[in-house]
């Protein structure tokens, strides 16, 4: 299949990969806190017959420098783009913080037909990175909608006093923060049952960045309690960064321990891939 790539610079840095002639199935592709444009993932989705738009959602021109009150309108604009190119079914595939964004956007934009959440969270978390003054505190929400911050979980910074050496597994930061600020949990919970979109969640049991398997089960419980469907794909030995068929593993991080292994992460990606394609196509 011939794939056409279009580089975009407005309203965000992005690449749109699609079959020659376009497609009625479109998907917005979101990275996590790396801030990268996931070109390789967009390409493999386009090779499967979809219009895949991978965007940079922070750190670019005119965008927040860090993940602090990033407007969810950033992602609805991506839906606009795919709709304008003829997509009749639109999905959003996000990983980690990108999955958080995908879920929150689908709750607010009924045009989104499906969300694929890879290593997701069930809670809205505080921002990642410093504010304009260079300070990490006071914590602000990662997201805003219509100019207002989305309620969020703050972090318990005491965790850093006993943090492991680099590369760090920071899952414990999230687990401690949830216990410390338990009174924030209800307001920060992602009401995924409100999304019209179909939902597919993919998680590894050895995720050391945050407890994505636990979060996946919570999201599923909310959906099912509301009489909504959800599909779960998991692998007990996989970590935070699954690899789909056709993707290459990046270099190991010197800063973070993502858990899992290349073998297990690849197995999870292979296991999930047919379900991902089915969900995005609406099969």
Predicted ranges, named:
Residues 35-36, 40, 80-154, 171-183:
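Primarily recognizes the serine-hydrolase "nucleophile elbow" in alpha/beta-hydrolase
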């Amino acid at each position: 299949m011939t794939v056409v790539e279009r580089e975009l610079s407005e309203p965000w840095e992005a690449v749109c990969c699609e079959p020659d002639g376009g497609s009625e199935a479109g998907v917005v592709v979101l990275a996590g806190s790396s801030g990268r444009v996931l070109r390789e993932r967009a390409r493999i989705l386009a090779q499967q017959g979809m219009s895949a738009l991978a965007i940079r959602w922070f750190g670019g021109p005119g965008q927040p420098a860090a993940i602090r009150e990033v407007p969810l309108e950033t992602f609805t604009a991506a839906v606009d783009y795919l709709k304008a190119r003829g997509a009749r079914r639109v999905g959003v595939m996000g990983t980690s913080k990108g999955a958080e964004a995908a879920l929150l956007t689908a709750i607010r934009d009924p045009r989104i037909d499906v969300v694929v959440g890879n290593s997701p969270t069930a809670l809205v978390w505080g921002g990642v990175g410093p504010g304009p003054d260079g300070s990490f505190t006071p914590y602000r929400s990662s997201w805003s909608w219509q100019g207002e911050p989305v309620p969020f979980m703050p972090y318990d910074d005491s965790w850093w006093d006993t943090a492991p050496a680099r590369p760090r597994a920071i899952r414990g930061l999230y687990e401690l923060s949830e216990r410390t600020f338990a009174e924030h949990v209800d307001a920060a919970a992602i009401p995924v049952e409100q999304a019209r979109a179909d939902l597919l969640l993919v998680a590894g049991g050895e995720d050391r960045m945050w407890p994505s398997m636990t979060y996946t089960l919570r999201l599923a419980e909310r959906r099912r309690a509301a009489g909504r469907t959800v599909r779960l794909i998991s692998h007990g030995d996989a970590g935070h960064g699954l690899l789909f068929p056709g993707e290459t593993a990046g270099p190991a991080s010197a800063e973070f321990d993502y858990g899992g292994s290349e073998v297990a992460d690849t197995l999870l990606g292979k296991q999930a891939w047919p379900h991902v394609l089915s969900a995005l196509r609406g099969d």
